[in-house]
Amino acid sequence: MLTFLIPTAKEMTTPKESHPHLLPQDSQAILKIMTAMTTEDLAKSYRIKEEAAKKEQQRWQDMASQQSLAYPAYQLFNGLMYRHIKRDKLTTQEQAYLTQQVYITSSFYGIIPANHPIAEHRHDFHTRIKIEGQSLKSYWRPCYNQFAKEHPQVISLLSSEFDDVFSKDCKQLWISPKFMAEKEGQFKTHSTISKKARGAFLTACMENNCQTVDSLKSLVFAGFYYHPDLSTDYEFVYIKKEA
């Protein structure tokens, strides 16, 4: 069985379905630090204006006082990649695929199933805090490595900020899809292409119920197709021709 890892997103939208918010034990130490930060501290940590930091501060305070609602993570996050993932009108098989084989890597919650209930928050591995004298990446590394050991065949749709959260020896069987546009024989990639394609790729995997590495090679989605000459055992390259 394939396991997919996807990142969080800064952009969020409030879904209709909500749940009580239950915070994992490992997240409690981070919450304690975040709620102790002033608006000015948060603005510096997030590199945002103080007005925006006030909103984030209120979210942390609501979490600490157990006033927050929680929403299925894959519905709450609404960045470019998430908007290209099929999230509505799923078949029973697609819903099972999404909730059992897709996991979200979070700097606040750890690694969670795609439908895990989470509260609105802003937090990533660029957030400048120390937990028990450790960086966020060092703090989460044991948890992340344990997940990798339990799920050796991972399809990683993660961005570069996650590269060194996992130890190298835990990623030996990982495959990282790469998405490129071809125009007049020239190949290019950029953030927008990659984010849209990650969502479309995951949707195609769900719709086709991909369960083997070889099945990924036959996928055609949003104009992309597998390119064997540019691919390696650990990096699958998908090309889209541009006019």
Curated annotation (Swiss-Prot):
Belongs to the UPF0246 family. It comes from the Bacteria. GO terms for biological process: response to hydroperoxide. This is UPF0246 protein SpyM51747. InterPro entries: YaaA (IPR005583). GO terms for cellular component: cytosol. It comes from Streptococcus pyogenes serotype M5 (strain Manfredo).
